[in-house]
Amino acid sequence: MKNNTMNTLIGAAQDESPVDLLVRNVRLVNVLSGEIHDAHIAVKDGIVVGFEEYEALHVVEGNGRHCIPGLIDGHIHIESTLLSPARFAAAAAPHGTAAVMCDPHEIANVMGAEGIEYMLHASAGLPLSVYVMMPSCVPATHMETAGATLRAEDVQDFLSRYPDRMPGLAEMMNYPGVLFRDDEVMAKLEAAASHVIDGHAPLLRGKALNAYVLGGPASDHETSDADEAREKLRKGMHLMIREGGSQEHNLEELVTVLNEFNTQNVSFVSDDKVVNDLMESGHMDDILRKAMAAGIPPVRAVQMASINTARYFRLHRRGAVAPGYRADFVLLDDLQTMRISECYLGGRNVKEIDFTGHSAAFSANTVHVAGLNTDSLHVAAGNGNLRVIGIVPGQVITHALELPPTLREGAAVADPSRDLAKLAVFERHKGTGNVGLGFTAGLGLHKGALAGTVSHDSHNLIVAGMDDADMITAAEEVQCIGGGLAVACDGRVLASLPLPIAGLMSDAPVEDVLAGLRGVNEALATLGYKLSSPFAALAFLSLAVIPSLKLTDKGLVDVHKFEIVPLWTA
């Protein structure tokens, strides 16, 4: 804070000049003292100056409403919303979100450093603060083809050039690389050693967890089991409770732990939140609603969505409502149900903020696919059973199934009667012609196909379907629109959604993106698709760092073995 600003604030706190805003008579959820008390909120130059009565240029009557700090999401991939940073901010701010810790490894896997620069530029100066964590694993594994590679020197470069925007290193997904002390992984950890280093350690326990923590990662958002959560908290990790889109729900399983332990090292995160979930259910407000309904006391719940996150990421004077803190706060008509009345960012009412002036141009075509034809989908009959990816509803983990094939004319084919769909991942960054083939159970498709360039983490072109020709039709539509989502059946495209920003996001108005996504979801519903957020489920079937079985453009990945395995068991 500059001296002239400090002088102004000190003077305003002593009634030397009117404050800009006074919100009178609120019940403040004080995340610093851990209580709820009466207060006025006085704001000058976007900063809280006191809880007392002040002369003000603008007065808002709180009328006893609860006031909570602006909420902070400790781990989100903005790209997963399908919205550009500015469009996302406009959609999230009315839900009480004041800041997010964004990991742009989705666009980084497509465009490398250029993609990170785009996210930094597109989010600069937004009223909703977007902090950008430096992606640690691009590509996520050696078993897939990404559009770029980021090395330790890139980590050093970005963290040194953007000290105020980039708190540290994003989720270190390559935990085997930490345990085996891979040279490049260790170099990245060393480059970020003085910064925050986020972890990513699903099911990691015991001595392996000890070794991982000693390497530098200090948090984890992949915990889905209560005993696992207890161990990670006892070993000093910052536990991020993930409650995001349709495939990421960990809160219910971990509530008992939150009521047993001191929660100062616990935060809530959304991770991946698709635009329809964001607009229909909310953002961090939705997580708080669920947390309090599950029995977590309101003050503790709010702390886990504000001050705990701010302290972990070393955000100065953020995450609370108190003198000297940025004036991000939310007025609630009802605390328990998180019924929001008004939101303020830097002392400005969100309803009066224009987010549209922050859009950044993007023109690159990032979809380059070779070999899109039905011949590329042929799976010749083999020996033994098929290794099949079994979808777990509501989770990003999958089961590794071994099932007998359905054969036709010497080839393994999809079988709607068994809920067995064919799955393909086409490399789309360099036109190599790579295609990985497999099968998945649990989509619920009766016919047709769906395709998209949103496929974690390398974001190649992923296609699932019951008919090879429909799979190619859907894939060709995605290529034609420059990336996005498409549904096809009986040789024609039923619906599609263009995502021209790296095949991941759109800068179209939120309402247009939402309408497009609803269109593809409705088209899928006519084909029998049964999962609540269709493309979110498909997008994670290629995520080769989450157990158990996944598919990349290089083939079927056994995540536990961390190697590519044959499609056939014998």
Curated annotation (Swiss-Prot):
- List the cofactors: Mn(2+)
Q: Does the keyword Transferase apply?
A: no
Q: What InterPro entries does its record include?
A: Adenine_deam, Adenine_deam_C, Amidohydro-rel, Metal-dep_hydrolase_composite, Metal_Hydrolase
Question: Which EC number(s) are documented for this chain?
Answer: 3.5.4.2
Offer one Pfam family short name for this entry.
Amidohydro_1
Look up the domain of life of the source.
Bacteria
Question: What catalytic activity does the UniProt entry give for this protein?
Answer: adenine + H2O + H(+) = hypoxanthine + NH4(+)
Would you indicate the residue range of the signal peptide?
none
Give the GO biological process terms: adenine catabolic process
GO MF: adenine deaminase activity
HAMAP family reported for this sequence: Adenine_deamin
Q: What is this protein called?
A: Adenine deaminase
